[in-house]
Amino acid sequence: MFHQAKWDEPTIFELSRPGRIGYTLPKPIEDVDVDIPEKLRRKSPLNLPELSEPEVVKHYTRLSEMNYGVDSGIYPLGSCTMKYNPKINEEIASHPGVAYVHPYQDEGTVQGALKIMWELEQWLKEITGMDRFTLQPAAGANGEFTGVSIIRAYHIDRGETQRTEMLVPDSAHGTNPASAAMAGFKVIEIPSNENGTVDLEALENAVSERTAGLMLTNPNTLGIFEDEILEIAKIVHKAGGLLYYDGANLNAVLGKIRPGDMGFDVVHLNLHKTFSTPHGGGGPGSGPVGVKDFLKDYLPVPLVSYDAENDRYYLDYNVPRSIGKVKELYGNFAVIVRALTYLKIMGREGLKEVSEVAVLNANYLTQKLKGTRGYELPGKELRKHETVFSAEPMKKETGVKALDVAKRLLDFCMHAPTIYFPLIVHEALMIEPTETVSKEELDAYVEALKRISEEAYSNPEVVTSAPHNTAVRRVDDVLAAKKPVITWRMYRELKERGEIDY
């Protein structure tokens, strides 16, 4: 049984002692006189913790011992594709030619960096069937906002200002309706049918002259392939709308089918999911957006282009109807480097195998867990890259909820799946094992879920009071949402005002 390391570790600010030094800045070669305007000068010294190098190393080592990541074990967060990140990605990204390049350098001095971005675009175009890409968006939701903003600009440019509605399935990622709303659209929800796919009759009834587009993930968040996608595309296009592809689940179809061939006009991808770049605790990510040829003039500036005659890469600002910039500079470059490294190592056939094994793993787990007391499998049985079970029967019969199952899994040294999503499945357990998990790990995960089922029906308190072996057991989710304390400064100020007592 797993027992997490537990250190009563202070923050690095609490460990700070005046005068301790871990690093000394190099002296300038010559005196530098920089005239910084008074209004931009700090009024007080920068509050940096003062520690020796050994103290810093020990502090972060102790914290790492309490952490769990993709290098620790199975991490099957549904719809997140928490696959192993090959270490060669880090080796290439830390190369001085990558690490020390500066975005304000002259184009002539960064030809290698521009070539990397251009080459990645060629890979993504081939994988998705799109005609042009921007690498600027910083993450998936940023990519979504970029994509729907392009759709909005396209309709306005055509004088179709009445197209104010964005259709979104009820199984969609929560960021889809949020991104559409931020771009100024009214969100229209499309229900799923009994198979877990888009209800075509409901879609037919929803489209109109007000339809700007439909945002769709394929496979969807149940792990089910939208097998009527060509008919869906036909319905949306006939109404004058555009089809948007949320690339969160692209890992299921790499090298097998392309969004562009399914009828999609706009695509966003997640390099930090499909292409093995780190999720990094919320960033940095990368959410490139690809479009069909008729939309390329709306992409953010600059694009990276290649002048074959002079064998030169350059930043192309000649994008007549561009929606403008969606992130400063050119995107998260080090993430782009990691993704291209992965693609070059895997190759065309390797990417096909990625999808094959990801789908195999998800279906193997589904069949092993299916029929276990308390877990119900909604929708079609055949899944793609992920599977969703409902713990609703267990909750009704024992009082043990999906949250309790997730917490109990931590005691087995296994990361919990995504829970309570998609919203159309009550007490959802959303499991995406990815292709980098072994059969033995899958077997162990299923056995843990089966054991939790046995505990729920024989001694439910063991599950409802879990986890028992972690450094932190259950946090106050309501307090965390109502009064988040996310910085040391916030903590000190709230503590001084007596608003928190911990």
From Swiss-Prot:
Its cofactor is pyridoxal 5'-phosphate. Its EC number is 1.4.4.2. It catalyses: N(6)-[(R)-lipoyl]-L-lysyl-[glycine-cleavage complex H protein] + glycine + H(+) = N(6)-[(R)-S(8)-aminomethyldihydrolipoyl]-L-lysyl-[glycine-cleavage complex H protein] + CO2. Signal peptide: none annotated. GO terms for cellular component: cytosol; glycine cleavage complex. GO terms for biological process: glycine decarboxylation via glycine cleavage system. InterPro entries: GcvPB, GDC-P_C, GDC-P_N, GDC_P, PyrdxlP-dep_Trfase, PyrdxlP-dep_Trfase_major, PyrdxlP-dep_Trfase_small. The keyword Oxidoreductase applies. It is an enzyme of class 1 (oxidoreductase). Keywords: Oxidoreductase, Pyridoxal phosphate. Coiled coil: none annotated. The modification N6-(pyridoxal phosphate)lysine is found at residue 273. NCBIfam families: PRK04366.1. The glycine cleavage system catalyzes the degradation of glycine. The P protein binds the alpha-amino group of glycine through its pyridoxal phosphate cofactor; CO(2) is released and the remaining methylamine moiety is then transferred to the lipoamide cofactor of the H protein. Belongs to the GcvP family. C-terminal subunit subfamily. The glycine cleavage system is composed of four proteins: P, T, L and H. In this organism, the P 'protein' is a heterodimer of two subunits. This is Probable glycine dehydrogenase (decarboxylating) subunit 2. It comes from Thermococcus kodakarensis (strain ATCC BAA-918 / JCM 12380 / KOD1). The lineage of its organism: Archaea, Methanobacteriati, Methanobacteriota, Thermococci, Thermococcales.
